[in-house]
A protein has these predicted regions:
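Basic Lys/Arg-rich amphipathic helical interaction modules
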Residues: 1-16, 20, 24, 46-79
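Major-groove DNA-recognition helix of helix-turn-helix-type DNA-binding domains
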Residues: 15-42
């Protein structure tokens, strides 16, 4: 059985970003998390992380739809 909550380092591994980036996402409210224990360690619920990833997929698809690739963009990427 998978753990319900993930440490920020685990979230960073899933998202392929640094732990400090995940911490910033949590502190800014972008990624929902809870603070537990006497030392106040952050935990992200696995289902919330999956919802966050789905939200980012949706936002990215919408951005791509609103910002289609142009020939100029394609030429710049080739450089």
């Amino acid at each position: 059985m998978e753990a319900r909550f993930l440490q920020l380092s685990d979230v960073a591994e899933v998202l392929n970003v640094s732990a400090s980036q995940v911490y910033h996402m949590v502190r800014s409210g972008e990624l929902p998390a809870i603070k537990i224990g006497g030392r106040g360690q952050w935990r992200v619920e696995r289902t919330r992380l999956e919802a966050y990833i789905e939200q980012k997929h949706t936002e990215t698809a919408q951005w791509i739809k609103e910002n289609p690739l142009t020939l100029r963009d394609d030429a710049e990427d080739a450089i």
